[in-house]
A protein has these predicted regions:
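Catalytic activation segment of kinase domains across protein kinase-like and atypical kinase folds
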Residues: 1-44, 52-56
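Regulatory N- and C-terminal appendages and interdomain linkers associated
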Residues: 30-120
Length: 120
């Protein structure tokens, strides 16, 4: 994760083909810390590490209150992007379809990227 939003490649990585939330793209990650499913928590860990750098400049309570905004913002944006990928309205908040679709994709070993490419 880069504060500038750049993509950094430290390799060896891969891409998510067959949808499997527990898939690990980093071949040196034996415990699944960086699995697809764990990406949000790793993002929060990275933000915590960055916040530590500012701990002498910003009160701890303020840092904590800002870090607590991460998960709700991430979930909201993720759901909105999934709605967009699926051609659903932006204001749709019934996420059962998204969740069921991902379960089916995992069960049937559907190529994640190809599925959404074909859908578009």
């Amino acid at each position: 994760m880069c504060i500038l939003g750049n993509t950094l490649d430290y390799g060896p990585f891969g891409f998510l083909d067959r949808y499997d939330p527990m898939w690990i793209c980093n071949t040196s990650d034996y415990n699944g810390r960086y699995s697809f499913h764990n990406q949000p928590s790793v993002g929060l860990w990275n933000l915590n590490a960055l916040a530590t750098c500012f701990s002498k400049l910003i009160k701890k309570e303020k840092i904590i209150s800002k870090l607590r905004l991460y998960e709700p913002a991430l979930v909201k944006e993720y759901r909105a992007l999934m709605n967009q990928k699926l051609g659903l309205s932006d204001d749709s908040t019934d996420y059962k379809f998204q969740d069921e679709l991902l379960k089916i994709m995992q069960r049937d070993k559907v190529d994640y990227t190809f599925f959404f490419r074909q859908l578009s």
